[in-house]
Amino acid sequence: MTTVKFKYKGEEKQVDTSKIKKVWRVGKMISFTYDEGGGKTGRGAVSEKDAPKELLQMLEKQKK
């Protein structure tokens, strides 16, 4: 699977697209929630131009 690299609260993070639960658009940013493990949910955002195509495909699927 593909990984998404992003910054959250000044910290560089990356998450596998298979762990992403929900995706939505906020202006030119793509926001998402993902499973951190241990029952925790993480949040992240990446600019539309830096988003991998798999993340954009997930966004399109959720719109329908």
Curated annotation (Swiss-Prot):
<dbReference type="InterPro" id="IPR003212">
    <property type="entry name" value="DNA-bd_7a-e_arc"/>
</dbReference>
<comment type="function">
    <text>Can constrain negative DNA supercoils. May be involved in maintaining the integrity of the genome at high temperature.</text>
</comment>
<dbReference type="GO" id="GO:0005737">
    <property type="term" value="C:cytoplasm"/>
</dbReference>
<keyword id="KW-0238">DNA-binding</keyword>
<comment type="subunit">
    <text>Monomer.</text>
</comment>
<protein>
    <recommendedName>
        <fullName>DNA-binding protein 7b</fullName>
    </recommendedName>
</protein>
<dbReference type="InterPro" id="IPR016197">
    <property type="entry name" value="Chromo-like_dom_sf"/>
</dbReference>
<dbReference type="GO" id="GO:0003677">
    <property type="term" value="F:DNA binding"/>
</dbReference>
<comment type="similarity">
    <text>Belongs to the 7 kDa DNA-binding/endoribonuclease P2 family.</text>
</comment>
<dbReference type="Pfam" id="PF02294">
    <property type="entry name" value="7kD_DNA_binding"/>
</dbReference>
<dbReference type="GO" id="GO:0004521">
    <property type="term" value="F:RNA endonuclease activity"/>
</dbReference>
<keyword id="KW-0963">Cytoplasm</keyword>
